[in-house]
């Protein structure tokens, strides 16, 4: 579903297939690095928790999966150009209060596609947000999928948390109540979009094992134990990048290993081609460009953090309902959704071009994207693929399609 020419008024609807793309000043999109919250430095708070809890890394979690996914022998519903994939178990397929959104793989984390560095594992991560008006908001969970055996993937959910202090000065943590619409795994770091504010960062070398008996408690309980709503592991936030420039709706995120240096790109969702910045939670300098955008920041592979806090590329693209983005240099791939009953579409455009092109159909409810190059020597397909996750209960899939749509 593409768009009309560059929008000049907020109410313009997108009905035609051409889409207008324009390169705009990248310098207006800036971030500020943040290593603390109101309770103190993330590092100090996490160190305090480490004195109370058993610390593990992502390798240990992936080795401790407790659920079995269902291998897909063919493409899910409307998807084309299918390569591989799976469906969640019956409970996660049916649950209505947890909804999957973001996806990333060990082919993002390391160039050869294998995890850990120097290892032989193949893994995927998927983010979910909680939504139940009748219950306590449990925030965001992250699923670690062991995909080393594609015919029988296994997985485990963990809870994303922010380290805090209690009113009595004890180390604790709170749930992170965000949409988590896009995630990106780069080395030991996991980047998670914070829709109105920027990026949250998590160190996959630092998770904590917690007690599981209390499914309605998060953090330090009155019994002296720590809980994560029944999940065995919690992953604490380690850093943040807060938006300081022109407003940006951080909807999805993708890694670009084809750029020099490596970079990340962020895309914006809009219902009808006009980005909604009305929420009071948005932070920045107040400037608004309401046409959806793809914005790039360079990465430093030595420490896996941002190389610069100022964007190096920004393009507008009048495309509605963008749910995911990945880029290969100046070529950008978008997942475009169309509700609970219609197919999604993988579309592509080149920076500065005036049209998007359909690559192939995606499954109903398509969300985030992750690029998996055929050059990933350890975990390679015969051609490059793009991973996608879908959100609607009953039709939830994680699958890969050929990047060229063949």
State each model region's role.
Residues 137-150, 202-222, 279-302, 343-354, ...:
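Beta-propeller blade signature
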Residues 54, 58-96, 153-174, 214-249, ...:
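Surface-exposed loop and turn segments in beta-propeller and other repeat-based domains
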Residues 109, 129-130, 189, 196, ...:
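Residue-level signature of beta-propeller blades and closely related beta-rich strand-turn architectures
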Residues 2-91, 401-406:
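Sequence/structural signature of beta-propeller modules
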Residues 86-116, 127-181:
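Blade-loop segments of beta-propeller domains
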Residues 93-120, 175-186, 245-263, 318, ...:
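Structural signature of eukaryotic scaffold interfaces centered on beta-propeller domains
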Residues 122-128, 189-193, 262-268, 326, ...:
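Short beta-strand elements that form the blades of beta-propeller/WD-repeat-like
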Residues 108, 263-368, 374, 404:
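Loop/turn-rich, solvent-exposed surfaces of beta-rich toroidal or solenoidal domains
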């Amino acid at each position: 579903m593409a768009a009309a020419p560059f929008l000049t008024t907020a109410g313009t609807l997108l009905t035609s297939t051409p889409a207008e793309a324009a390169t705009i000043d990248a310098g207006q999109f800036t971030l500020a690095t943040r290593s603390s919250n109101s309770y103190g430095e993330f590092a100090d708070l996490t160190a305090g928790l480490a004195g109370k809890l058993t610390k593990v890394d992502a390798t240990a979690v992936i080795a401790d999966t407790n659920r079995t996914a269902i291998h897909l022998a063919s493409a899910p519903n409307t998807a084309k150009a299918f390569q591989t994939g799976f469906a969640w178990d019956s409970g996660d397929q049916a649950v209505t209060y947890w909804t999957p959104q973001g996806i990333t793989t060990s082919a993002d984390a390391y160039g050869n596609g294998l995890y850990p560095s120097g290892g032989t594992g193949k893994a995927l991560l998927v983010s979910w947000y909680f939504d139940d008006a009748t219950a306590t908001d449990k925030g965001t969970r992250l699923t670690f999928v062991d995909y080393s055996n594609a015919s029988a993937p296994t997985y485990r959910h963990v809870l994303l948390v922010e380290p805090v202090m209690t009113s009595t000065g004890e180390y604790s943590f709170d749930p992170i109540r965000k949409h988590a619409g896009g995630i990106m795994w780069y080395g030991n770091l996991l980047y998670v979009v914070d829709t109105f504010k920027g990026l949250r960062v998590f160190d996959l070398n630092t998770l904590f094992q917690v007690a599981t008996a209390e499914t309605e408690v998060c953090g330090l309980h009155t019994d002296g134990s720590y809980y994560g709503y029944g999940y065995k592991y919690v992953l604490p936030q380690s850093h943040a990048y807060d938006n300081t420039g022109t407003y940006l709706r951080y909807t999805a995120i993708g890694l670009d290993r084809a750029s020099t240096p490596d970079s990340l790109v962020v895309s914006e969702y809009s219902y009808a081609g006009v980005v909604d910045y009305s929420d009071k939670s948005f932070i920045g300098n107040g400037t608004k460009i309401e046409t959806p955008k793809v914005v790039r920041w360079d990465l430093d592979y030595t420490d896996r953090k941002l190389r610069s806090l100022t964007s190096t590329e920004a393009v507008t693209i009048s495309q509605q309902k963008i749910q995911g983005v990945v880029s290969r240099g100046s070529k950008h791939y978008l997942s475009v959704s169309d509700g609970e009953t219609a197919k999604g579409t993988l579309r592509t455009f080149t920076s500065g071009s005036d049209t998007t092109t359909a690559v192939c159909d995606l499954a109903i409810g398509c969300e985030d994207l992750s690029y998996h190059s055929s050059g990933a020597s350890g975990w390679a397909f015969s051609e490059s693929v793009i991973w996608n996750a879908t959100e609607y209960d009953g039709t939830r899939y994680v699958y890969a399609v050929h990047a060229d749509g063949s």
